[in-house]
């Protein structure tokens, strides 16, 4: 079986810091701990309203990360310019609404093909690997291919939020089919959103999945067990699922 990689999203360390307007806990420190615990990359979402990760965080993390930065961002001129200046290894283009608590669904690539293709081409020309955060839908996967994106990240939120085991199994089948279809097109497949210690194994077991991006569950577990153990435990579950 191929390896599977873990990108640790540290947004909610910044959420905790910003709740009191303090300098702690510092997501830069969190990234260091996560890397030592086995994270293969660090994911951060610089939102337009800067509700958690800030420009300062992006700048310092770019200088200090020992693994790779995956910068999640909306498809706006401001964010594209920040990415071009920062030069992260990866950019994941995501939909964004100011009123949402977290990203609610996949990017409608098919409905905004020209705009997303232009952004993808601009970032790619700068040497940045582009991923598109989409639902496991053939139309969206085809559109991602048409944009020239080498990566997609399949939205696992519907799987994670399924009300029954039967519904969850249906969502897993959709993700598995989408991952297989994308891989056949030559696209590298990541996945994430809503994954926890209890539901991650079936997703991690899918052979086409290259990397999982997980944040909220890890930071939540870290409150009780410490961040190092929380990251290491998640990585262990993922690796075991691939055996």
UniProtKB/Swiss-Prot annotation:
Compartments where found: Cytoplasm
GO cellular component: cytosol
Gene3D superfamilies: Aldolase class I
Alphabetized SUPFAM superfamilies for the sequence: Pyridoxine 5'-phosphate synthase (SSF63892)
Keyword flag 4Fe-4S: no
UniProt-listed Enzyme Commission number(s): 2.6.99.2
Catalytic activity, reaction form: 3-amino-2-oxopropyl phosphate + 1-deoxy-D-xylulose 5-phosphate = pyridoxine 5'-phosphate + phosphate + 2 H2O + H(+)
GO MF terms held by the record: pyridoxine 5'-phosphate synthase activity
Pathway(s) annotated for this protein in UniProt: Cofactor biosynthesis; pyridoxine 5'-phosphate biosynthesis; pyridoxine 5'-phosphate from D-erythrose 4-phosphate: step 5/5
Any one of the GO BP annotations: pyridoxine biosynthetic process
CDD domains reported for this sequence: PNPsynthase
Sites where the protein binds 1-deoxy-D-xylulose 5-phosphate: 11-12, 47, 52, 102
Catalytic residue list: 45 (proton acceptor), 72 (proton acceptor), 193 (proton donor)
Function per UniProt: Catalyzes the complicated ring closure reaction between the two acyclic compounds 1-deoxy-D-xylulose-5-phosphate (DXP) and 3-amino-2-oxopropyl phosphate (1-amino-acetone-3-phosphate or AAP) to form pyridoxine 5'-phosphate (PNP) and inorganic phosphate.
Family: Belongs to the PNP synthase family.
Protein name: Pyridoxine 5'-phosphate synthase
Organism encoding this protein: Vibrio vulnificus (strain YJ016)
């Amino acid at each position: 079986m191929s390896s599977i990689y873990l990108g640790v999203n540290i947004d909610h360390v910044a959420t905790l810091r910003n709740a009191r307007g303090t300098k702690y806990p510092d997501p830069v420190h969190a990234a260091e701990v996560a890397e030592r615990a086995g994270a293969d990359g660090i994911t951060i979402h610089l939102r337009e309203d800067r509700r958690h990760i800030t420009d300062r965080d992006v700048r310092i993390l770019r200088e200090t990360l020992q693994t790779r930065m995956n910068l999640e961002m909306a498809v706006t001129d401001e964010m594209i310019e920040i990415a071009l200046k920062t030069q992260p290894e990866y950019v994941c283009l995501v939909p964004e609404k100011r009123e949402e608590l977290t990203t609610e669904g996949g990017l409608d690539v098919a409905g905004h093909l020209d705009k997303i293709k232009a952004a993808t081409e601009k970032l790619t020309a700068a040497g940045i690997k582009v991923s598109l955060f989409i639902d496991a839908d053939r139309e969206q996967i085809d559109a991602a291919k048409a944009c020239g994106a080498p990566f997609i990240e399949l939205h696992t939120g519907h799987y994670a939020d399924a009300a029954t085991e039967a519904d969850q199994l249906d969502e897993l089948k959709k993700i598995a089919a989408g991952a297989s279809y994308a891989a056949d097109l030559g696209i590298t497949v990541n996945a994430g959103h809503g994954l926890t210690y209890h539901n991650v194994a079936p997703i991690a077991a899918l052979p086409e999945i290259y990397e999982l991006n997980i944040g909220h569950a890890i930071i939540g577990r870290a409150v009780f067990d410490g961040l190092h153990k929380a990251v290491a435990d998640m990585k262990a579950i993922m690796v075991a699922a691939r055996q």
